[in-house]
Every structure is written in structure tokens, then in C-alpha cells.
A protein has these predicted regions:
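Class I S-adenosyl-L-methionine-dependent methyltransferase catalytic core
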Residues: 1-192
Length: 192
């Protein structure tokens, strides 16, 4: 997928405008039309094309150490983890690990958690393009404080996305590649 493809689909001139516009379009009643346009330029649904786009144009690799999991690593992990009814992807990014697990287990329900507001639209688009059923928590995994919870429901071709108030806890196989470079100080952590 070329940068210009996504700029044209979202109707914006700059890559930094894509996340906000993409999320707006994904939550609109015409989201199927958007997903069809993306599908026409996306390429292979077996890999995470948004991973490459996001890292090239939007990630903060220096400041936030946003280096996302390569598709090859995601593929290996997807093959190694046993079958489960539900997959939980903590620090999901654009969804590379989830997509690769889904490639091996297409009936899995997913639960993704992601902190970054800029990558959430790409994660939602990736899941909806594949007609995946699941929940996406946008917020802090450690504190359990969320900006939004998104529910994806299978449709005829693409998942529909709705913002929901809450979701019951989910259990399942866990796959994750957290930002190991983030600093953490347990001194003032209430949990300890």
C-alpha cells in the first residue's frame, strides 16, 4: 500500500491527518465502502500492511520506541501458539500478532488492548477488513483506564465497529510484544 492510496481514501493531504480521519470513517454508517476501498489497495490480507505504513509515516521510533513486530515474527508466533477460542493481544499496535494468529485460527474471537490513539484506527481497520469478531480496548492496560472500548461484530464481508460502554472480562491465549524499552518505577505504584 502506498502512502498516496491511504491519503486519497481518507481525503487528507498529510499522513499525520490519517488516524483521526480513518477512525471517523470507520465509525460512520458507510464504513463498508471505506473498507472496500482499502481492500482494493491493501494487498495480502495474510500480512499487516498497516504495520509498514505506520512505522514509515507515523510512529515515534526515537521518542516512544515504537518499533512494531515484523510480520515474519508475527507469523512464527501465530504458528507456535496453540488453538484457543479467544486470543488476547496486549500492546496490539496495528494488529500484526493478532492477524498472524487469525491466519492459523480464523474462527478465534479477539481481545486487543492498545494505548496509542494514533495506531487504534489502523488496528480497527485491520480487524474489520478480515471480518474478525472481538473487542478492542483503547487505553492503559496496567491501570485498566480506557478512553474507548470498541466492539467488532462479523458482517457479510467486513466487521462493524461500535463504541460500547463496557465489556465483560475475556479469557484466552495471550500473545504480546510490549514496549520493553519503557521505563517503570514501582515505588509509587498502588498495586505494590
Amino acid at each position: 500500500m502506498k502512502e498516496t492510496d491511504l491519503l486519497n481514501i481518507c481525503g487528507v493531504n498529510e499522513s499525520f491527518d490519517v488516524p483521526v480521519k480513518l477512525l471517523e470513517l470507520l465509525l460512520s454508517p458507510n464504513s463498508d465502502q471505506l473498507l472496500e476501498q482499502i481492500s482494493n489497495v491493501y494487498g495480502d490480507l495474510q500480512i499487516d500492511e498497516f504495520n509498514i505504513y505506520y512505522q514509515t509515516y507515523l510512529s515515534e521510533r526515537g521518542k516512544l520506541k515504537q518499533d512494531y513486530t515484523p510480520n515474519e515474527v508475527g507469523k512464527l508466533l501465530g504458528m507456535l501458539i496453540g488453538e484457543a477460542d479467544t486470543l488476547i493481544d496486549v500492546c496490539a499496535g496495528s494488529g500484526t500478532l493478532t492477524i498472524n494468529y487469525w491466519n492459523e485460527h480464523p474462527n478465534v474471537k479477539v481481545c486487543c488492548e492498545e494505548f496509542s490513539s494514533r495506531v487504534i484506527p489502523f488496528l480497527l481497520a485491520n480487524l474489520a477488513l478480515r471480518n474478525i469478531d472481538g473487542i478492542v480496548y483503547h487505553g492503559d492496560t496496567l491501570t485498566r483506564k480506557y478512553e474507548h472500548i470498541y466492539r467488532l461484530c462479523k458482517g457479510d464481508k467486513y466487521s462493524t465497529i461500535q463504541i460500547v460502554e463496557e465489556s465483560k472480562p475475556i479469557e484466552g491465549a495471550v500473545i504480546m510484544n510490549p514496549p520493553y524499552s519503557l521505563g517503570w518505577n514501582p515505588m509509587n505504584d498502588e498495586r505494590l
